[in-house]
Amino acid sequence: MTEGSKVSEIMKNLSMQVNLDDFIPATEEEKEYMVQMRPSTTAFKDGIRRLRKNKVAMVSFYIILIITLSAIFVPMFWPYKYEMMLGMQPGKPVDATFNNLRPFEYSASELALKEQGQKVFPHIFGTDSAGRDYFIRVVYGTRISLAVGFFASIIVLVIGLLVGSVSGYAGGKVDMFIMRIVDIIYSLPDMLMVILLASVLKMTLASKLDGTPLAKIGSNIISLFIIFALLYWVSMARLVRGQILSLREQEYVLAAQAAGAKGGWVIRKHLLPNCVSVIVISTALQIPSAIFTESYLSFLGLGVNAPMPSLGSLASDALNGLSSYPYRLVIPAIVISLIVLSLNLFGDGLRDAFDPKLNS
Protein backbone atom coordinates (compact mmCIF):
# COMPACT_ATOMS: atom_id res chain seq x y z
CA MET A 1 0.00 0.00 0.00
CA THR A 2 1.40 3.34 -1.01
CA GLU A 3 1.96 6.15 1.42
CA GLY A 4 -0.78 8.21 -0.20
CA SER A 5 -3.36 5.46 0.19
CA LYS A 6 -2.39 5.04 3.87
CA VAL A 7 -2.90 8.73 4.50
CA SER A 8 -6.30 8.66 2.79
CA GLU A 9 -7.31 5.63 4.87
CA ILE A 10 -6.30 7.40 8.09
CA MET A 11 -8.16 10.55 7.08
CA LYS A 12 -11.22 8.46 6.28
CA ASN A 13 -11.14 6.90 9.74
CA LEU A 14 -10.73 10.32 11.37
CA SER A 15 -13.56 11.83 9.33
CA MET A 16 -16.61 13.07 11.25
CA GLN A 17 -18.92 11.72 8.58
CA VAL A 18 -21.00 8.70 9.61
CA ASN A 19 -21.02 5.67 7.37
CA LEU A 20 -24.57 4.30 7.48
CA ASP A 21 -23.40 0.93 6.20
CA ASP A 22 -21.70 0.31 9.55
CA PHE A 23 -25.07 0.23 11.40
CA ILE A 24 -27.76 -2.44 11.60
CA PRO A 25 -31.17 -1.15 10.44
CA ALA A 26 -33.68 -0.58 13.25
CA THR A 27 -36.67 -2.87 13.54
CA GLU A 28 -40.24 -1.56 13.29
CA GLU A 29 -40.68 -1.92 17.08
CA GLU A 30 -37.53 0.13 17.71
CA LYS A 31 -38.71 2.79 15.28
CA GLU A 32 -42.05 3.11 17.12
CA TYR A 33 -40.23 3.37 20.43
CA MET A 34 -37.94 6.11 19.16
CA VAL A 35 -40.77 8.32 17.90
CA GLN A 36 -42.52 8.23 21.26
CA MET A 37 -41.77 11.54 22.94
CA ARG A 38 -42.26 12.20 26.62
CA PRO A 39 -44.95 14.85 27.15
CA SER A 40 -43.82 18.15 28.58
CA THR A 41 -44.48 18.64 32.28
CA THR A 42 -44.71 21.48 34.77
CA ALA A 43 -44.12 21.73 38.50
CA PHE A 44 -47.88 21.54 39.06
CA LYS A 45 -48.30 18.44 36.89
CA ASP A 46 -45.30 16.84 38.54
CA GLY A 47 -46.78 17.54 41.97
CA ILE A 48 -50.15 16.08 40.95
CA ARG A 49 -48.37 12.96 39.67
CA ARG A 50 -46.61 12.49 43.01
CA LEU A 51 -49.85 13.17 44.89
CA ARG A 52 -51.69 10.49 42.93
CA LYS A 53 -49.01 7.96 43.85
CA ASN A 54 -49.60 8.69 47.55
CA LYS A 55 -52.35 6.17 48.33
CA VAL A 56 -53.01 7.47 51.84
CA ALA A 57 -53.50 11.03 50.59
CA MET A 58 -55.78 9.93 47.75
CA VAL A 59 -57.95 7.78 50.04
CA SER A 60 -58.20 10.76 52.40
CA PHE A 61 -59.15 13.02 49.49
CA TYR A 62 -61.98 10.71 48.39
CA ILE A 63 -63.26 10.45 51.97
CA ILE A 64 -63.34 14.26 52.21
CA LEU A 65 -65.05 14.47 48.82
CA ILE A 66 -67.74 11.93 49.76
CA ILE A 67 -68.42 13.61 53.11
CA THR A 68 -68.58 17.08 51.52
CA LEU A 69 -70.90 16.03 48.69
CA SER A 70 -73.14 14.19 51.15
CA ALA A 71 -73.33 17.22 53.43
CA ILE A 72 -74.31 19.42 50.48
CA PHE A 73 -76.78 17.25 48.57
CA VAL A 74 -78.37 14.83 51.08
CA PRO A 75 -80.46 17.55 52.84
CA MET A 76 -81.93 18.52 49.45
CA PHE A 77 -83.90 15.28 49.03
CA TRP A 78 -84.12 13.95 52.60
CA PRO A 79 -87.78 13.98 53.73
CA TYR A 80 -86.97 15.29 57.22
CA LYS A 81 -85.57 18.72 58.09
CA TYR A 82 -82.97 19.25 60.80
CA GLU A 83 -85.29 21.47 62.90
CA MET A 84 -88.49 19.44 62.29
CA MET A 85 -90.03 18.01 65.48
CA LEU A 86 -91.83 15.01 64.03
CA GLY A 87 -94.15 14.59 67.00
CA MET A 88 -95.49 18.15 66.70
CA GLN A 89 -97.52 18.37 63.48
CA PRO A 90 -99.86 21.35 62.86
CA GLY A 91 -103.46 20.55 63.79
CA LYS A 92 -102.54 17.26 65.48
CA PRO A 93 -101.94 16.34 69.12
CA VAL A 94 -98.36 15.95 70.27
CA ASP A 95 -97.03 12.44 69.60
CA ALA A 96 -94.36 11.71 72.22
CA THR A 97 -93.57 8.33 70.66
CA PHE A 98 -91.33 10.16 68.14
CA ASN A 99 -88.93 11.12 70.93
CA ASN A 100 -85.77 9.09 71.53
CA LEU A 101 -86.32 6.54 68.78
CA ARG A 102 -83.45 4.13 68.27
CA PRO A 103 -81.91 3.50 64.82
CA PHE A 104 -84.53 2.19 62.33
CA GLU A 105 -87.23 2.32 65.02
CA TYR A 106 -90.68 3.75 64.23
CA SER A 107 -93.17 5.75 66.28
CA ALA A 108 -96.68 4.50 67.06
CA SER A 109 -98.25 6.56 64.28
CA GLU A 110 -95.64 5.38 61.77
CA LEU A 111 -96.24 1.75 62.73
CA ALA A 112 -99.97 2.30 62.14
CA LEU A 113 -99.22 3.68 58.68
CA LYS A 114 -97.01 0.69 57.90
CA GLU A 115 -99.82 -1.68 58.93
CA GLN A 116 -102.05 0.12 56.43
CA GLY A 117 -99.52 -0.64 53.70
CA GLN A 118 -98.07 2.86 53.42
CA LYS A 119 -94.35 3.44 53.07
CA VAL A 120 -92.60 5.25 55.90
CA PHE A 121 -89.08 6.62 55.51
CA PRO A 122 -86.86 5.10 58.23
CA HIS A 123 -84.94 7.00 60.88
CA ILE A 124 -81.46 5.64 60.17
CA PHE A 125 -79.90 7.03 63.36
CA GLY A 126 -83.19 7.30 65.26
CA THR A 127 -84.43 10.58 66.74
CA ASP A 128 -83.28 12.85 69.55
CA SER A 129 -85.13 13.84 72.71
CA ALA A 130 -87.15 16.46 70.78
CA GLY A 131 -88.27 13.99 68.10
CA ARG A 132 -85.95 15.30 65.37
CA ASP A 133 -84.39 12.90 62.86
CA TYR A 134 -80.82 12.38 64.06
CA PHE A 135 -79.34 11.38 60.71
CA ILE A 136 -80.23 14.66 58.98
CA ARG A 137 -78.99 16.59 62.02
CA VAL A 138 -75.61 14.82 61.75
CA VAL A 139 -75.47 15.53 58.01
CA TYR A 140 -76.43 19.18 58.47
CA GLY A 141 -74.03 19.50 61.40
CA THR A 142 -71.27 18.18 59.13
CA ARG A 143 -72.18 20.85 56.56
CA ILE A 144 -71.98 23.59 59.20
CA SER A 145 -68.65 22.36 60.57
CA LEU A 146 -67.13 22.08 57.08
CA ALA A 147 -68.43 25.53 56.09
CA VAL A 148 -67.06 27.15 59.25
CA GLY A 149 -63.69 25.44 58.76
CA PHE A 150 -63.48 26.47 55.10
CA PHE A 151 -64.47 30.12 55.53
CA ALA A 152 -62.38 30.52 58.68
CA SER A 153 -59.37 29.24 56.74
CA ILE A 154 -60.07 31.75 53.95
CA ILE A 155 -60.11 34.56 56.54
CA VAL A 156 -56.81 33.33 57.99
CA LEU A 157 -55.35 33.06 54.48
CA VAL A 158 -56.29 36.62 53.46
CA ILE A 159 -55.04 38.26 56.66
CA GLY A 160 -51.90 36.12 56.81
CA LEU A 161 -51.04 36.88 53.17
CA LEU A 162 -51.52 40.60 53.62
CA VAL A 163 -49.59 40.93 56.88
CA GLY A 164 -46.84 38.45 55.98
CA SER A 165 -46.15 39.90 52.52
CA VAL A 166 -46.00 43.48 53.83
CA SER A 167 -43.74 42.47 56.71
CA GLY A 168 -41.36 40.42 54.57
CA TYR A 169 -41.12 42.89 51.68
CA ALA A 170 -40.90 46.11 53.72
CA GLY A 171 -38.39 44.83 56.28
CA GLY A 172 -36.78 47.16 58.79
CA LYS A 173 -38.96 48.76 61.46
CA VAL A 174 -42.19 47.66 59.78
CA ASP A 175 -41.10 44.03 59.91
CA MET A 176 -39.92 44.35 63.50
CA PHE A 177 -43.21 45.97 64.61
CA ILE A 178 -45.39 43.34 62.95
CA MET A 179 -43.29 40.47 64.26
CA ARG A 180 -43.54 41.79 67.81
CA ILE A 181 -47.33 41.75 67.47
CA VAL A 182 -47.09 38.18 66.21
CA ASP A 183 -44.91 37.23 69.19
CA ILE A 184 -47.44 38.76 71.60
CA ILE A 185 -50.33 36.81 70.05
CA TYR A 186 -48.24 33.63 70.12
CA SER A 187 -47.60 34.12 73.83
CA LEU A 188 -51.33 34.16 74.68
CA PRO A 189 -52.92 30.88 75.86
CA ASP A 190 -54.98 29.74 72.88
CA MET A 191 -57.80 27.87 74.59
CA LEU A 192 -58.35 30.50 77.27
CA MET A 193 -58.39 33.39 74.79
CA VAL A 194 -60.75 31.58 72.41
CA ILE A 195 -63.24 30.76 75.18
CA LEU A 196 -62.99 34.28 76.64
CA LEU A 197 -63.49 36.00 73.28
CA ALA A 198 -66.33 33.65 72.34
CA SER A 199 -68.15 34.44 75.58
CA VAL A 200 -67.70 38.20 75.25
CA LEU A 201 -68.57 38.36 71.55
CA LYS A 202 -71.62 36.13 72.02
CA MET A 203 -73.18 38.65 74.41
CA THR A 204 -72.04 41.69 72.43
CA LEU A 205 -73.16 40.56 68.98
CA ALA A 206 -76.49 39.01 69.97
CA SER A 207 -78.20 42.39 70.40
CA LYS A 208 -76.42 44.17 67.56
CA LEU A 209 -77.27 41.59 64.90
CA ASP A 210 -81.03 41.55 65.53
CA GLY A 211 -82.92 42.62 62.42
CA THR A 212 -79.87 42.39 60.14
CA PRO A 213 -79.15 39.80 57.40
CA LEU A 214 -76.32 38.43 59.56
CA ALA A 215 -78.86 37.39 62.20
CA LYS A 216 -79.68 34.32 60.07
CA ILE A 217 -76.08 33.17 60.34
CA GLY A 218 -76.09 33.62 64.10
CA SER A 219 -74.00 35.64 66.51
CA ASN A 220 -71.99 32.61 67.59
CA ILE A 221 -70.76 31.79 64.07
CA ILE A 222 -69.92 35.45 63.45
CA SER A 223 -67.96 35.48 66.71
CA LEU A 224 -66.06 32.37 65.53
CA PHE A 225 -64.97 34.16 62.37
CA ILE A 226 -63.87 37.19 64.42
CA ILE A 227 -61.84 34.93 66.72
CA PHE A 228 -60.02 33.39 63.76
CA ALA A 229 -59.41 36.84 62.31
CA LEU A 230 -57.87 38.00 65.60
CA LEU A 231 -55.81 35.00 66.70
CA TYR A 232 -55.17 32.41 63.99
CA TRP A 233 -53.49 34.41 61.20
CA VAL A 234 -50.07 34.55 62.86
CA SER A 235 -48.81 31.17 61.58
CA MET A 236 -49.76 32.02 58.00
CA ALA A 237 -48.16 35.47 58.33
CA ARG A 238 -44.88 33.97 59.60
CA LEU A 239 -44.84 31.42 56.81
CA VAL A 240 -45.49 34.00 54.07
CA ARG A 241 -42.95 36.41 55.58
CA GLY A 242 -40.26 33.72 55.51
CA GLN A 243 -41.00 32.93 51.87
CA ILE A 244 -40.96 36.62 50.90
CA LEU A 245 -37.63 37.18 52.68
CA SER A 246 -36.05 34.32 50.74
CA LEU A 247 -37.42 35.52 47.38
CA ARG A 248 -37.06 39.29 47.51
CA GLU A 249 -33.32 39.19 46.73
CA GLN A 250 -33.80 37.14 43.58
CA GLU A 251 -32.64 38.67 40.30
CA TYR A 252 -36.10 38.96 38.76
CA VAL A 253 -37.33 40.90 41.81
CA LEU A 254 -34.33 43.24 41.71
CA ALA A 255 -34.89 43.73 37.97
CA ALA A 256 -38.53 44.67 38.56
CA GLN A 257 -37.52 47.12 41.29
CA ALA A 258 -34.86 48.65 39.03
CA ALA A 259 -37.50 49.11 36.33
CA GLY A 260 -39.55 51.21 38.75
CA ALA A 261 -42.17 48.64 39.74
CA LYS A 262 -44.03 49.42 42.96
CA GLY A 263 -43.91 47.12 45.95
CA GLY A 264 -47.52 45.98 45.64
CA TRP A 265 -47.02 45.02 42.00
CA VAL A 266 -43.83 43.09 42.79
CA ILE A 267 -45.59 41.20 45.59
CA ARG A 268 -48.60 40.31 43.42
CA LYS A 269 -46.73 39.44 40.22
CA HIS A 270 -43.46 37.93 41.43
CA LEU A 271 -43.42 37.01 45.11
CA LEU A 272 -46.83 35.54 45.95
CA PRO A 273 -47.04 33.37 42.78
CA ASN A 274 -43.81 31.67 43.87
CA CYS A 275 -45.30 30.95 47.30
CA VAL A 276 -48.51 29.32 46.03
CA SER A 277 -47.57 25.72 46.84
CA VAL A 278 -46.60 26.53 50.42
CA ILE A 279 -49.71 28.69 50.90
CA VAL A 280 -52.05 25.99 49.59
CA ILE A 281 -50.49 23.37 51.85
CA SER A 282 -50.75 25.60 54.92
CA THR A 283 -54.38 26.47 54.14
CA ALA A 284 -55.27 22.79 53.71
CA LEU A 285 -53.77 22.06 57.13
CA GLN A 286 -55.60 25.05 58.66
CA ILE A 287 -59.07 23.69 57.79
CA PRO A 288 -59.01 20.74 60.28
CA SER A 289 -57.75 23.09 62.99
CA ALA A 290 -60.69 25.42 62.35
CA ILE A 291 -63.16 22.52 62.39
CA PHE A 292 -61.74 21.24 65.66
CA THR A 293 -61.94 24.72 67.22
CA GLU A 294 -65.58 25.10 66.16
CA SER A 295 -66.39 21.64 67.48
CA TYR A 296 -65.05 22.16 70.97
CA LEU A 297 -66.61 25.63 71.22
CA SER A 298 -69.96 24.14 70.20
CA PHE A 299 -69.38 21.39 72.74
CA LEU A 300 -69.01 24.11 75.39
CA GLY A 301 -72.17 25.87 74.20
CA LEU A 302 -70.30 28.72 72.49
CA GLY A 303 -70.69 27.47 68.93
CA VAL A 304 -73.62 27.63 66.52
CA ASN A 305 -77.00 28.94 67.65
CA ALA A 306 -79.81 26.46 68.34
CA PRO A 307 -81.68 24.81 66.67
CA MET A 308 -78.92 24.81 64.03
CA PRO A 309 -76.72 21.77 64.70
CA SER A 310 -73.00 21.27 64.43
CA LEU A 311 -70.98 18.17 65.21
CA GLY A 312 -69.75 19.70 68.46
CA SER A 313 -73.22 20.73 69.66
CA LEU A 314 -74.61 17.28 68.80
CA ALA A 315 -71.90 15.67 70.91
CA SER A 316 -72.66 18.09 73.75
CA ASP A 317 -76.41 17.38 73.63
CA ALA A 318 -75.72 13.63 73.63
CA LEU A 319 -74.15 13.82 77.10
CA ASN A 320 -77.59 14.14 78.73
CA GLY A 321 -78.63 10.65 77.62
CA LEU A 322 -75.20 9.07 77.37
CA SER A 323 -76.02 5.96 79.42
CA SER A 324 -79.17 5.18 77.39
CA TYR A 325 -78.17 6.42 73.93
CA PRO A 326 -74.36 6.29 73.67
CA TYR A 327 -74.46 6.17 69.85
CA ARG A 328 -75.58 9.82 69.80
CA LEU A 329 -72.15 10.77 71.11
CA VAL A 330 -70.22 8.15 69.15
CA ILE A 331 -71.62 9.12 65.72
CA PRO A 332 -70.63 12.83 65.70
CA ALA A 333 -67.33 11.97 67.39
CA ILE A 334 -66.50 9.50 64.60
CA VAL A 335 -67.45 12.04 61.91
CA ILE A 336 -65.28 14.75 63.51
CA SER A 337 -62.35 12.36 63.83
CA LEU A 338 -62.75 11.14 60.25
CA ILE A 339 -62.88 14.67 58.81
CA VAL A 340 -59.94 15.99 60.83
CA LEU A 341 -57.79 12.89 60.21
CA SER A 342 -58.55 12.86 56.46
CA LEU A 343 -57.80 16.57 56.08
CA ASN A 344 -54.53 16.23 57.99
CA LEU A 345 -53.41 13.23 55.93
CA PHE A 346 -54.37 14.96 52.69
CA GLY A 347 -52.51 18.09 53.79
CA ASP A 348 -49.43 15.98 54.51
CA GLY A 349 -49.76 14.47 51.04
CA LEU A 350 -49.93 17.92 49.47
CA ARG A 351 -46.82 18.95 51.38
CA ASP A 352 -44.91 15.87 50.25
CA ALA A 353 -45.97 16.42 46.63
CA PHE A 354 -45.54 20.16 46.23
CA ASP A 355 -43.03 21.36 48.83
CA PRO A 356 -39.81 21.93 46.86
CA LYS A 357 -37.65 21.61 49.97
CA LEU A 358 -38.76 18.02 50.45
CA ASN A 359 -38.19 17.18 46.79
CA SER A 360 -34.63 18.52 46.63
Pin down the residues of each PLM region.
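Alpha-helical transmembrane segments of integral membrane proteins
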Residues: 130-360
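Gly/Trp-centered helix-boundary motif
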Residues: 1-157, 161, 165, 307, ...
